[in-house]
Amino acid sequence: MSSGGLLLLLGFLTLWAELTPISGQNRPMFCHLPADSGRCKAHIPRFYYNPASNQCQGFTYGGCGGNANNFETRDQCRHTCGASGNVGPRPRIASN
């Protein structure tokens, strides 16, 4: 096979890996953690993966603490945790 053919194959496999959804078995464990606003009092919009609905949902992050199930964008959440494209409701997180 020529080097051009190998590069084309490599490009195709890379694209396929990026577009293939993550199965529940391959999902990082932190994707199963609950939304955690943390201990600080800022009001930063973030997203977390909700395994019950298989969706990335919005929550308000306090700015410190919390856990790894915390993403700046819905796309980051979907890419990392393999959520469906449906948009779920924005849950309310009680402030301390």
Swiss-Prot record:
Going by the UniProt record, its keywords in alphabetical order are: Disulfide bond, Protease inhibitor, Pyrrolidone carboxylic acid, Secreted, Serine protease inhibitor, Signal
**Signal sequence, renumbered to the chain:** 1-24
Keyword Signal assigned to the entry: answer is yes
- Kindly indicate whether the keyword Coiled coil belongs to this entry: no
Q: Which GO terms describe its molecular function?
A: serine-type endopeptidase inhibitor activity
The record's Gene Ontology cellular component field reads:
extracellular space
Extract the CDD domains matched here: Kunitz_PPTI-like
Q: Where is this site: Reactive bond for trypsin?
A: K41, A42
Distribution of this protein across tissues and organs: Expressed by the venom gland.
Give the top-rank taxon of the lineage listed in the UniProt record for this protein: Eukaryota
Which parts of this protein are propeptide? Answer: 85-96
Q: Which Pfam families match?
A: Kunitz_BPTI
State its location(s). Secreted
Cystines in this chain:
C31-C81, C40-C64, C56-C77
Q: For the BPTI/Kunitz inhibitor domain, which residue ranges apply?
A: 31-81
Q: InterPro entries under this entry?
A: Kunitz_BPTI (IPR002223), Kunitz_BPTI_sf (IPR036880), Prtase_inh_Kunz-CS (IPR020901), TFPI/VKTCI-like (IPR050098)
Question: Where in this protein does the record say Pyrrolidone carboxylic acid is found?
Answer: Q25
Q: What family classification does the UniProt entry report for this protein?
A: Belongs to the venom Kunitz-type family.
What does the function comment of this entry state?
Serine protease inhibitor.
Name recorded for this polypeptide:
Kunitz-type serine protease inhibitor C6
